[in-house]
Curated annotation (Swiss-Prot):
Principal location class: cytoplasm
Notes concerning its domains: Forms a beta-barrel structure that accommodates hydrophobic ligands in its interior.
Protein's UniProt name: Retinol-binding protein 2
Pfam families per the UniProt record, alphabetical: Lipocalin
Species whose genome carries this gene: Mus musculus
Positions annotated to bind all-trans-retinol: K41, Q109
CDD domains: CRBP2
Gene3D superfamilies, A to Z: 2.40.128.20
Tissues where the protein occurs: Expressed in prenatal liver, intestine and lung, and in adult intestine.
Amino acid sequence: MTKDQNGTWEMESNENFEGYMKALDIDFATRKIAVRLTQTKIITQDGDNFKTKTNSTFRNYDLDFTVGVEFDEHTKGLDGRHVKTLVTWEGNTLVCVQKGEKENRGWKQWVEGDKLYLELTCGDQVCRQVFKKK
């Protein structure tokens, strides 16, 4: 595994995305559209500074952060909530904790070979996404 997450990543699989969205109280119609979409992630990393773009035909979401620095995040690309977000390194894995209305919310992201792995968590729901480097 490596800490380098730079690149353009295309989604290969998206397991339990609907369960994750239900845990976030996302409406039925939006969930039905979102589960059918393929996402592309564009990550620009300079040390601990990240600029991330998640693009699909339905919605795009940009997230810029510095590892170890808590910030206010508006999750407008997903459920429209305001959360306090902190991203840290655990070995070569980015670990994000999002404090707010929903319990046990956050994500883990890491690279192995030409694959980017992302686990999204809310409550007892875990969505596992795999992306391949383009």
